[in-house]
Amino acid sequence: MQIHGVVPQAPFVGELPQEVTCVGIPTSAGVLTAAFIDEAVAGIVPKAESALEVHEVPHAGQQPEPVPALLVPGFTGSKEDFTPFLPYLAERGRSACAYSQRGQADSAAPKGVENYRLADFVGDLIEVARAMGASVRPIHLLGHSFGGVIARQAAVVAPELFRSVTLFSTGPRPPEAMRWTPLRQRLLSSTTGKKLSAWYISQFLSSDPRDELIAERAMVTSEDSLMGAAFILARYPDVSLPLRQSGLPVLITHGVGDTVWPEQMHREEAALLGARYEVVSDAKHSAQLENPAALADVLAAFWADIEAGRN
């Protein structure tokens, strides 16, 4: 897997899992940070060579390299929500890249809530996909929660960039609980609200390195980003029909205990799209952290079937 135009990037918090590399991807929003793993040897094309867009073509009889995947994190999240999960994909022969969306963690954070519209997040995703060479060889796309809202829209806007779409713990339209999200986020994203959140988290810190990550991320994530994402979550459009018309293979998956979007909504969308539907055992809203091996099995099987023409 090659990512074009990248710049060096230090990890946000703590150490990276072995074989995971952190980079910055220049976009219209600024540099978005990303973590990736290659199932073989990670390939980075330096910024000075980014216009080359070189891709190896398999020789006759040689098996093509597995299609890489782009992973998009959810609301209040970042690439770190997938960093521990990347080695599970590599163990199953999959290369993948997760990035922090604009305003998340150590990614670029343009000033002003007007810079956090649905189209802005979608545009970033498309730029990252192109940096991964999707214009030449379409990639698998996965969006988690709010990231699924962005992924769904990106697949409709630029279906030619993607081999498949996985909608992970995300729904086609806002559930009832999301209606109050902008008001809640307005309170939590204020300076006082963020300090209170960080203090509350600090009272329960353990030796788990993710506790440190969550506390640090709560303080540095852009307030404008949180507000923009909150408003999107409360009113984003249902694009199920255009997604079906795109012809892209779709997987809908979530943890068995996930209640953010109703299970019935997931099942109805899967039926409408003709999508594969998988429920991950022993997991709730973030199966990549709660039962990573099971989720990796689901994804690897889906992607392998797509590449073999079995979907």
Q: What positions do the PLM features span?
A:
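Conserved loop-alpha-helix segment in the C-terminal half of the alpha/beta-hydrolase fold
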Residues: V250-A283, L289
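Active-site loop/oxyanion-hole signature of alpha/beta-hydrolase fold enzymes
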Residues: S28, V41, K47-A48, E91, ...
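Conserved HGGG/HGGXW glycine-rich cap/lid loop of the alpha/beta-hydrolase fold
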Residues: T33-A40, I44-A109
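An N-terminal hydrophobic leader/cap segment in hydrolases
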Residues: M1-P26, A35-P46, A51, H55-V57
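Flexible "cap/lid" loop of the alpha/beta hydrolase fold
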Residues: R152, V156-V157, F162-T191
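Gly/Ala-rich beta-loop-alpha elbow adjacent to hydrolase catalytic centers
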Residues: G143, G147, A151
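Conserved alpha/beta-hydrolase catalytic His-Asp/Glu region
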Residues: E176-M178, T191-Q245
